[in-house]
Amino acid sequence: MREIVHIQIGQCGNQIGAKFWEMIGEEHGIDLAGSDRGASALQLERISVYYNEAYGRKYVPRAVLVDLEPGTMDSIRSSKLGALFQPDSFVHGNSGAGNNWAKGHYTEGAELIENVLEVVRHESESCDCLQGFQIVHSLGGGTGSGMGTLLMNKIREEYPDRIMNSFSVMPSPKVSDTVVEPYNAVLSIHQLIENADACFCIDNEALYDICFRTLKLTTPTYGDLNHLVSLTMSGITTSLRFPGQLNADLRKLAVNMVPFPRLHFFMPGFAPLTAQGSQQYRALSVAELTQQMFDARNTMAACDLRRGRYLTVACIFRGKMSTKEVDQQLLSVQTRNSSCFVEWIPNNVKVAVCDIPPRGLSMAATFIGNNTAIQEIFNRVSEHFSAMFKRKAFVHWYTSEGMDINEFGEAENNIHDLVSEYQQFQDAKAVLEEDEEVTEEAEMEPEDKGH
């Protein structure tokens, strides 16, 4: 079976990761002790993608849990999930990274990295045919961002032909924990551009907006935000975990979603959005799901979708529904909003349908969009970065860990390049909207692309 090794790193990564295992455990009928309590054979058909079967039919997550301080690990160990993971899967330091990317990437993280790679190798060796890795981390702190990207580089060196996916939580000024978040984020994105195959960008600002506007929560906690993220992660990985038709492995997902190697940053979305512990009172129709799924308010990345255009889209519908109706609804979205999809990638919306809905819902849909509007997130972070870097504020914390100041400039330039690449493809053939001669334009396109 095509296995995936899951790595959660840093406080944020570990908290979201724990939620993810709780949620997919419920979907596959695996209880907190790792035993099978499922009602359907489908639940176990592809269980080996994320779980190892140990003695006595106990299922153990293929997970590596990493942090530079013991706190989050201890709380996972003592939580209800504690007995699920293999004790060797926990790797932690004691000093912490102090929200400093350079500590995670060059000093503290570098000291621990060999221990982590040992566990990663051990997990990879127990796979029949490893398809790739997924890393869950945040970009605002020190460990998830600095050590997370270091780990990705090392795994890339050792497993160059395996797919590397990341679920990356982007910092936002509204939900800021530390002043140096823009530094940590830009330095991380600089690495992700080069070393990830697919990056699901989860933006704290968008998660807060969903909690306030849609779920009407007055004081959202990190638990509420993590619940939204785990819904999305469970949705995105559905076609990997259950027998389905489309994007059944990480490589196919990347091939369908990434038209140019650097443009691999996706915005996930989910419908229907429900708060933790709440029940949904009425089932939505396929039309309502489709409409909600494409609605910017349901997207986990805070940017204005009306300004951008979709390069590619993948949708995963879950529950008992007619595939024909799903296809019709998606077609009508594309015809009604044709200007939102680039016309030079025909059939750029892919869809999968899986019979098994998420727990507590009768139907749900997950959305993965590669939209040029994501440049707004990078712009936002890089503006804050530049404002501080002009004055060299806080830079001594990084250089004192042995980091070269030139790396800041390189990272800043790389992100500016990424933003202008998104802009270039957003504008490509924008003439079409005024011009009716669509077919002639399309025939001329290959020559236009040349220069």
UniProtKB/Swiss-Prot annotation:
Motif placement: MREI motif: 1-4
Modification 5-glutamyl polyglutamate occurs at: E440
SMART domains listed in its UniProt record: Tubulin, Tubulin_C
Span list, region Disordered: 432-451
Modified residues (Phosphoserine): S172
Keywords from the named record: Cytoplasm, Cytoskeleton, Disease variant, GTP-binding, Isopeptide bond, Magnesium, Metal-binding, Microtubule, Nucleotide-binding, Phosphoprotein
The record's note on its domains: The MREI motif is common among all beta-tubulin isoforms and may be critical for tubulin autoregulation.
Species: Homo sapiens
Family: Belongs to the tubulin family.
Protein name stated in the entry: Tubulin beta-1 chain
